[in-house]
Amino acid sequence: DESGTPGYPYCVAITMYPFLVDGLIKLGGVSVAPTDLKSFCGEFINLVYSISSQFMGAVATPEFLMYLDYFIRKDYGDDYLDHLEDVVEMNTKKRTLVKVIDNYFQQVVHSMNMPAGNRGYQTVFWNISYFDESYFRGVFGDFRFPDGSEPKWETLSWLQKHFMNWFNEERNRYILTFPVETMALLTDGKDDFIDKEYADFTAEMWSKGHSFFCYLSDSPDSLASCCRLRNSITELDKVDESHNHTTHQYSMGTASVSTGSKSVMTINLNRLIQLAT
């Protein structure tokens, strides 16, 4: 990377579970664990900015939408999809629930696209992930929130699709670089997708001009959170005599969601071509 030095931590994907338990205390902040949708969004912005100041590259939060859905359900109930058009803000605006959700989307996304002084007045490099149902259940099937509850696929699926459509439309009004998005789709190991609905939705979003990465895997043991980083748990025990590494790029994290990279060098081919001519 032309802007940095080798050896400095480049990018990282984090698990947000400690954030749910301790808030920002362990990072030197004063905010305790978020308790509702409003505090979650505000503290999440501070979380990403705090971590990004320690890295030159991306901060990936694959669980962002799953946690956002958790706090929406805490505030408005597990059946909030049945009340999207209900007025939930009794002020002069009289906003419906879906409008409130859109406003939180806007708060988080627009804040992430603001230049940061501790990053040379560049924005944070923020990545998120989407999952089809099979991939989601493979990665988060045994996951439980601190209160013992489990993620709810039906509401998360709606939230993922709604965010993608909202973000695609928002980019028609503003120049928004982040988040960089990765859609994780599980295949049958041959030439087809297990969750055909999400495969069709992915194609639909591309047809609408949306720009995002797509990660295909025949096993939910691995995860990609950005353009270059992939990790795999089950392949750790495989040995290839031709080299001494596996596909599990493990340097800073502790799980399939939490990982990172170091000394990543990006070749700027466009610049090389310009200099050569």
Question: What residues fall within each predicted segment?
Answer:
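Conserved catalytic cores of very large enzyme subunits
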Residues: 1-277
